[in-house]
Design a protein with these regions (language model features):
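The N-cap/first-turn positions of alpha helices
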Residues: 2-8, 29, 54, 61, ...
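Short helix-boundary/capping micro-motifs
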Residues: 12-27
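Core residues of bacterial helix-turn-helix
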Residues: 24-25, 36, 43, 64
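A short LG(V/I)-centered, amphipathic sequence patch enriched
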Residues: 40-59
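Alpha-helical linker/hinge and terminal dimerization helices associated
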Residues: 42-43, 64-86
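Central regulatory/effector-binding core of bacterial HTH transcription factors
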Residues: 90-124
Length: 124
């Protein structure tokens, strides 16, 4: 089971239509259909009930949907955190300075940095 298959499944389940879901995912409808079919084959379950008017969740799809949403949300959060880490807006900053200098200036700079980047842990 791949996350891209789960994304496709969630999108079809929410759109209720393969065409609309394919458009939103920037896929062709046949490519989307293949992803869903591969997922169903792998699980050995029919997740969606297809009819002339569109698609609705099969009972097994109803069971899978909340789990698929959580997995996708977790992946999105992990990728967002990694982007923040790479951009320097999350992580840890260690600062060492000599107390003999202008301490109020150093303290104000550190306070300003903490305010600007609250997700960065600052050790002094």
């Amino acid at each position: 089971m791949e996350l891209r298959q789960l994304r496709a499944f969630v999108e079809v389940a929410e759109a209720g239509h393969f065409g609309h879901a394919a458009e939103h995912l920037h896929l062709t409808q046949p490519a989307l259909t293949q992803r869903i079919q591969a997922l169903e084959r792998e699980l050995g379950l029919q997740l969606l009930e297809r009819n002339a008017r569109g698609v609705r969740l099969a009972p097994s799809g109803t069971v899978l949907l909340p789990h698929a949403r959580r997995l996708i949300q977790t992946e999105d959060q992990a990728l967002g955190d990694l982007r923040a880490y790479l951009s320097g807006t999350i992580g840890r900053l260690r600062i060492a300075y000599q107390a003999a200098g202008d301490i109020p200036t150093a303290a104000s700079l550190i306070a300003e940095y903490r305010q600007r980047f609250p997700a960065v842990e600052v050790d002094t």
